[in-house]
């Protein structure tokens, strides 16, 4: 019997940040006899029949760690094919002293630009670091393996062809400086017929301080009436929002591999992005120079249509959730 342990912060399709993780869980479960999910928060009804969920929720960080290890230990004794830690290096670090003596492979899935001591330490104890692209993790290590993003393409209908001019622009992502929303607002000032709708969570004090600054900038640029600053949305609402848009904008700085870019592409929408990581997905007409609003505005103005179906095909071929799950299992075999 093949058994896999998957550790994440939330296994809940309504979570605005981690809702897409449930599709990954289902794809993994389809390829093993039993999948054990350990998470702080779990929506049991969302898990497949061959999936067992254990919550390690607790009021304190120490309590969560203790409950996590208490749930993990008996699963390791049953010798799973691997433990996959999702996005949080601390899960791999805590698991290592228990997994290594039993020779249970340990994998970390990580796609953020920000690293830190926990990630550096986790790299030393895991067998493999899985990510979207070798550039989408702040590491240089032979342990890094690119396996695509794991997009649930079937959940994202292909919208009708969007022809220019693109008037209804959409941005999805945190209200954080790294997301480059100031660049997008300044580009909007050069597109007098366009509107912009933003939706995203505010996860930190810095995020909560940044949103009012963006609202003030919109007023300063005289685009306030054309911008909607929305809150975080449940993951299930994303296909609907994409269906309302003419195009998606993503100005995240650095080597970002933001999931929304792949989701928009899978929806056959033109998506304009600045990260170099998208050079294998987006044609030149959809890629702009980060921090240069005029570059983004010009790309939107000059878009002549036709990119949608090819974008979806590329996501399906290289970034589908089924392909992702298969590559995870191959990496820990």
Task: Annotate each PLM feature.
Residues 253:
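Aromatic "clamp/platform" in nucleotide-sugar-dependent glycosyltransferases that forms part
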Residues 40-42, 195-213:
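Glycosyltransferase donor-sugar binding loop
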Residues 268-274:
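Short hydrophobic beta-strand element within catalytic cores of glycosyltransferases
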Residues 5-7, 162-179, 185-191, 197-199:
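Conserved donor-binding/catalytic core segment of Leloir-type glycosyltransferases
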Residues 19-26, 176-194, 209-212:
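A conserved mid-protein helix/loop that constitutes part of the nucleotide-sugar donor-binding site
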Residues 205-211, 224-234, 241:
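Active-site donor-binding acidic/aromatic loop of nucleotide-activated sugar
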Residues 302-332:
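A charged, aromatic-enriched C-terminal amphipathic alpha-helix characteristic of glycosyltransferases
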């Amino acid at each position: 019997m093949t058994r896999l342990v998957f550790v994440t912060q939330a296994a809940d399709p309504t979570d605005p940040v981690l809702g897409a993780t449930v599709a990954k869980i289902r794809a993994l479960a389809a390829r093993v006899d039993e999948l054990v999910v350990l998470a702080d928060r779990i929506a049991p009804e969302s898990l497949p029949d061959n999936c067992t969920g254990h919550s390690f929720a607790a009021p304190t960080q120490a309590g969560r760690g203790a409950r996590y290890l208490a749930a993990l230990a008996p699963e390791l004794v049953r010798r799973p094919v691997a433990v996959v830690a999702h996005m949080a290096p601390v899960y791999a670090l805590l698991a290592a002293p228990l997994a290594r003596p039993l020779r249970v492979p340990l994998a970390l899935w990580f796609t953020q630009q920000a690293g830190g001591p926990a990630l550096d330490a986790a790299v030393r104890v895991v067998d493999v670091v899985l990510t979207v692209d070798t550039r989408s993790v702040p590491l240089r290590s032979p342990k890094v393996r690119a396996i695509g993003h794991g997009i649930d393409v079937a959940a994202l209908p292909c919208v009708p062809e969007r022809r220019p001019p693109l008037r209804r622009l959409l941005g999805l992502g945190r209200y954080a400086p790294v997301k480059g929303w100031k660049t997008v607002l300044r580009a909007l000032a050069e597109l007098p017929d366009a509107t912009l709708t933003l939706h995203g969570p505010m996860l930190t004090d810095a995020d909560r301080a940044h949103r009012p600054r963006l609202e003030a900038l919109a007023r300063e640029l005289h685009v306030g009436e054309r911008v909607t600053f929305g809150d975080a949305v449940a993951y299930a609402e994303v296909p609907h929002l994409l269906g309302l848009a003419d195009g998606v904008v993503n100005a995240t700085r650095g080597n970002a591999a933001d999931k929304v870019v792949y989701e928009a592409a899978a929806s056959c929408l033109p998506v304009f992005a600045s990260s170099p990581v998208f050079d294998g997905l987006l044609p030149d007409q959809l890629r702009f120079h980060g921090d240069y609003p005029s570059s983004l505005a010009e790309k939107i103005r000059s878009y002549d249509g036709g990119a949608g179906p090819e974008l979806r095909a590329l996501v399906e071929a290289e970034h589908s959730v089924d392909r992702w799950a298969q590559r995870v299992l191959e990496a820990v075999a």
